[in-house]
Amino acid sequence: MPFFNHLDASLTLGTTGIGFDVATPVGNYVQLRAGWAFMPPIHQHMHFDVQVGETKESKYDANGNRVETKFDKMAALLEDLSGYKVEDEVEMIGRPTYHNLKVMVDVFPFIRDRRWHITAGFFWGPSKIADGYNVTEAMPSLLALGMYNRLYDKTMISYESVQKFRRGEIAPYEIIPVFSIGQYEINSPTEIESLYKMLSSYGRMGMPLGKMTDENGVSHTYMMVPNEEGMVKAEVRTNSFKPYLGVGYGGRLLKNDDRFHVAVDLGAMFWGGSPRIITHDGTDLARDVHGIKGKVGDYVEIIKGFKVFPVVDVRFIYSIF
């Protein structure tokens, strides 16, 4: 019986990426194959709208005239304060990042016709298979957006302390300032209340993606906002260990040369359920958020549908000995 009496090397191209493997027989009907494959980082551009508050505003009136929105007002304020121009959309780049080791067992059920084979095995690699991040050109807008939300949040906290002061629960010096620069502080109750009135009528600024339900069962708009680094990111994750089952067909590549062969493998890589799409704040877009619209929503629905990843690979084989 032939055990490890010859060795094949292959270049692989297909839905698992670009890679290589080596194979050797283990008996008359079985071949052991191992290799590695990676997917080149093909970039896909996506755009996210930026808005103030949870309700989307129209930029035009009934007559088609451009009107000033809450976003326009806040963008002008932020540009005046920070010098950064805030755009009404943020561009992100999505790319595949997966690469896997693979171990396969090919079984040739027909001893007189070794063109057909059945394959079982597994892929193993990082759980992150894709990611997304904002482009450099979006950084000024994201930094300004983060500054606005910081001002908004601190104003809400300061306003609560002013209300306690109004009720006589705390002393004037215990009022939490909106911010301080050296010894200068914005802690005047009147100033804080005026700022609160303006900002609370607008809401926080962010990129609305869809609806999500909190722990109390209340539905609200999920607004993606930049992290502490002023960036927005997302990752697509699956199980690291991914079983595989498939079939294949192969034959000689050149009519009179047994050293060169080609084989096509068709099968399924089992991801262990729908992939998770995790943003930088820990939100799972595939499970926690629904009703995502536009191109981003299309991508999310496609990714959610791939509980099993279709494998279509072509192997160009060279017999070393």
Which ranges hold each PLM region?
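Short loop/turn motifs that connect adjacent beta-strands in outer-membrane beta-barrel proteins
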Residues: 1-6, 29, 110-116, 131, ...
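Membrane-embedded beta-strand positions of outer-membrane beta-barrel proteins
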Residues: 9-11, 22, 32-34, 105, ...
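Extracellular/periplasm-exposed beta-strand and loop segments of Gram-negative cell-envelope proteins
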Residues: 1, 6-10, 41-99, 127-240, ...
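Hydrophobic, lipid-facing positions within transmembrane beta-strands of outer-membrane proteins
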Residues: 7, 16-20, 30, 99-103, ...
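Ordered, amphipathic secondary-structure segments that act as subunit-interaction surfaces
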Residues: 95-128
